[in-house]
């Protein structure tokens, strides 16, 4: 009974946080995005005026749009393609302030937390670029190529 159960998610987060590869990702992002990160730290989006970071709230807008687009793509049929494209676009627009707020938070992190944040940012960068490609491929009579990208 005294053995604590550690979930798979907790083990993955711990492994990412302790990985030297994650440190390499963090170092590369610091090098690549250095000036943006410095600006993000001073931006109005990096504030705790609400008692906490605004980054988690902004992610709800971005992810909500992309989830809605996914649902419309899967279940909405051809009549929902325009709405799905609109949601992808709004999600992409929202991803900018979301990333800035996250970068400002990340700039103040260190150690394991910073490595996990760097891997998180890498994943969201990849998703953003895939969705940008999806949006570009959507116009026209055959929007399936834009949907198939993700």
Model-derived regions: residue spans:
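Short amphipathic, positively biased membrane-proximal segments
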Residues: 1-150
